[in-house]
Amino acid sequence: MLLLTEAVKPALTDCSCHARSARGCYRPCATVGAIVYAFSMQLHNYFRSSASHRVRIALELKGLQYEYAAIHIARGDHKKTPYTALSADTLVPLLEVDGEKLSQSMAIIEYLDEKYPTPALLPADSVGRARVRALAQSIACDIHPINNLRIIKYLVTELKLEDAAKNAWYSHWCREGLEAFERQLAQRPASTFCHGDLPTLADCCLAPQIFNAHRFNVSVEGLPRTMAAYAACMALPAFQKAHPSNCPDFEP
């Protein structure tokens, strides 16, 4: 993650661009004197978004510098200009790179893996790639969609669910999905990460899901392979740097 340093922030006091935050100007055109601070990638994301979290992990694993553009989903920033002019689906994450606007976390990560193949986030063999994608999609396609903020908000505002019922909904589907994930891991010999001894796309998806499981007090007991892989992930600096608590827009 590439952010403007404390030393240059005072020079940006008069910056008139829209992309300001408490930590300075996060716009690729930001200038300080005669120096232009150019960013090759700009990630529009929200610290608490699982999909955004996945992409941050991938960027950190590959050692890629990027500009962090905070979009506060809970406050509805994704439904306001100027973001609506950038994102067709008004969701996060959105990666601006090489003049293109890429959406959907899984597509973004696969783009990064093709563009910057080292370290690889997918195995070299076709069966291994299929297995890693299946593990990743069991989280990104089975658990996440029915438990994301849009769904939870609808349950509360439209269906009038109380907090207890809302949390029961989240816990049920999250736990059921993690149990299925554990069974998939158990089909193969034990490994450090979800697939083998290096982190893959599956681990990029797992870590954010466990973060949210902890946040909603979902039990992770009886998931030994899953939690061992998660522990291995969180021992790596890349996963630590990408963690929501280390994001510039983090809120407790």
Model region roles, listed by residue range:
Residues 1-11:
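Extreme N-terminal basic, low-complexity initiation segments
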